[in-house]
């Protein structure tokens, strides 16, 4: 099993948690981005740089993810593709995407896209907080505990 990160928009605090987890568990951690990313020297951590472009990193993750792998992303369509392939998806804020909730999340995303296209401003996500950092760390620990079994 591996942990894949949609790394271009992933908060640094989450990356730090993931670096520690990769070292602690010896689980492969792959950060996929269209720019260079600094990572600690480790045999468990690597980067995969892709070309710039719409969904290029997402498509590369979907192509490589295996059943049981975890993907860290806030991209709902990417999460849906990962779940379809038998993987798990978690946001950097600690929310888990599941077979039970992904369709509803896609519907809400599509609705919000329609609202934005019609000129209604919806705002963006709130700044990343310490509470969300803890929620992510706890959700990651739950996944790692399940993966050990």
Curated annotation (Swiss-Prot):
Superkingdom: Bacteria
Pfam family, one: DUF188
InterPro entries in UniProt: UPF0178
Protein family (similarity comment): Belongs to the UPF0178 family.
Stated name of the protein: UPF0178 protein Tola_2809
Organism per entry: Tolumonas auensis (strain DSM 9187 / NBRC 110442 / TA 4)
């Amino acid at each position: 099993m591996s942990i894949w990160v949609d790394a271009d928009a992933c908060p640094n605090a989450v990356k730090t948690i993931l670096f520690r987890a990769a070292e602690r568990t010896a689980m492969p951690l792959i950060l996929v981005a269209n720019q260079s990313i600094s990572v600690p020297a480790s045999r468990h951590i690597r980067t995969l740089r892709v070309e710039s472009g719409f969904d290029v990193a997402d498509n590369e993750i979907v192509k490589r993810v295996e059943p049981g792998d975890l993907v860290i992303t806030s991209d709902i369509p990417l999460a849906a593709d990962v779940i379809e392939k038998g993987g798990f998806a978690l946001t950097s804020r600690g929310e888990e995407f599941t077979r039970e909730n992904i369709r509803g999340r896609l519907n809400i995303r599509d609705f919000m896209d329609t609202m934005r296209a019609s000129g209604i401003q919806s705002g963006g996500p709130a700044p990343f907080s310490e509470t969300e950092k803890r929620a992510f760390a706890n959700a990651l620990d739950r996944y790692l505990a399940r993966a050990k079994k």
